Amino acid sequence: MGLQPSPVLLASLGVGLLTLLGVALGAYLVRRSRRPPVTLLDPNEKYQLRLLDKTTVNHNTKRFRFALPTAHHVLGLPVGKHVYLSARIDGSLVIRPYTPVTSDEDQGYVDLVIKVYLKGVHPKFPEGGKMSQYLDSLKIGDVVEFRGPSGLLTYAGKGKFNIQPNKKAPPEARVARNLGMIAGGTGITPMLQLIRAILKDPEDPTQCFLLFANQTEKDIILREDLEELQARHPGRFKLWFTLDHPPEGWAYSKGFVSVDMIREHLPAPGEDVLLLLCGPPPMVQLACHPSLDKLGYSPKMRFTY
C-alpha cells in the first residue's frame, strides 16, 4: 500500500491554496479599484460635458477644454478612436467628429483643438463652419453632448492595429513596423494621438513618419508638440512639413502632397507598412490617393479617417 497523505498535510495545503487565491483576488481588486472611472461607458449614449476653458491657439484655431464628471474621471477613448459632438443649431441637429489632443492619462478633463471657420471668410464656405462657430460662441459653463468611442481603427500597441473595413464588419488585425501618416490642417489630431501613444512606450518598435500639409506657416497647429516629440525621439519619429504658400527661407517642402514628397519622407510600400490619411477631402482624394497609387501602395496598406 502507498503512503496516504495525512489530514494535517491536506489541511495545510488547502489553507495555503486559499491564502494564495485570496492574495491574488485582493491584488486584482486593488488594481481594479485604482483604475479611474470612465466617462464614455456606452458608445450609443450622449454625455453632457461642461466647457471649462477656451484658449486661442493661432489666428483661426482654439483649444476647448471640457470637464469630465469628476476630477478623477478619464474620457475612456481607445487610441485610434474619436468622439462625436452634437448640437441643435438654427433648428437643425449638427454632428461632427473630433479627436481629442488629451489622452486617458489626463483625468478630469478632455481637450479639443478646433479650427473655427467664420462666416464670410472663405468664398467656398460663405456660412462658415456650423459646429466650430457654435463652439466658439459657448460661454464657460455651457454644456455640449459627446458620444463615443467611435471609429474603425484601434491601436492595440507595439505596432498592432485592428481595422474594420466598415462599421458592420469585424476588425482585421494589421501589424505595422513602419507607420506613415499624411495629415492636412486639423487632420493632425488623430495622428498626434497615435504618435504620442507609440512614443511613450519604449518597447514599441513602430517607426513613425509624418507628412503634415498646411496652407501657410501660421496655419500649422500643434507644431511645438510635434517638434518636441521629434527632438526627444529622433530615431523613432520623422517629421516633415509642406505649405501651399511658404515664407521666404522655408526649410521644408512647397505645394500639394506629391509623389516625390511621399517617396522621400514616408516609408516605401511593404508588408510591414501602414499609411494613415486625414485631412480635407480634396487633399486626400485628389492629391494623396493618386500619388499612392503611382507608388504602388495597395489598398491594404492605407487607412483614411
Curated annotation (Swiss-Prot):
UniProt entry keywords in alphabetical sequence: FAD, Flavoprotein, Lipid biosynthesis, Lipid metabolism, Membrane, NAD, Oxidoreductase, Steroid biosynthesis, Steroid metabolism, Sterol biosynthesis, Sterol metabolism, Transmembrane, Transmembrane helix
Name of the coding gene: CYB5R1
Identification of the protein by name: NADH-cytochrome b5 reductase 1
GO biological process: sterol biosynthetic process
Domain FAD-binding FR-type: start-end pairs: 44-156
Catalysis performed (reactions): 2 Fe(III)-[cytochrome b5] + NADH = 2 Fe(II)-[cytochrome b5] + NAD(+) + H(+)
Cellular component terms per the entry's GO annotation: membrane; mitochondrion
Superkingdom classification of source: Eukaryota
Organism of derivation: Bos taurus
Function per UniProt: NADH-cytochrome b5 reductases are involved in desaturation and elongation of fatty acids, cholesterol biosynthesis, drug metabolism, and, in erythrocyte, methemoglobin reduction.
Documented EC number(s): 1.6.2.2
Source lineage: Eukaryota, Metazoa, Chordata, Craniata, Vertebrata
InterPro entries: CBR-like (IPR001834), Cbr1-like_FAD-bd_dom (IPR008333), FAD-bd_FR_type (IPR017927), Flavoprot_Pyr_Nucl_cyt_Rdtase (IPR001709), FNR_nucleotide-bd (IPR039261), OxRdtase_FAD/NAD-bd (IPR001433), Riboflavin_synthase-like_b-brl (IPR017938)
Pfam families: FAD_binding_6, NAD_binding_1
CDD domains, alphabetized: cyt_b5_reduct_like
A GO MF label: cytochrome-b5 reductase activity, acting on NAD(P)H
Intracellular or extracellular location(s): Membrane
Transmembrane intervals: 8-28
Cofactors (names): FAD
Family designation: Belongs to the flavoprotein pyridine nucleotide cytochrome reductase family.
PROSITE patterns found in the cross-reference section: FAD_FR
PANTHER family: NADH-CYTOCHROME B5 REDUCTASE, NADH-CYTOCHROME B5 REDUCTASE 1
Residue sites binding FAD per the record: 136-166, 175-210
Membrane topology summary: Single-pass membrane protein
Keyword Transmembrane helix: yes
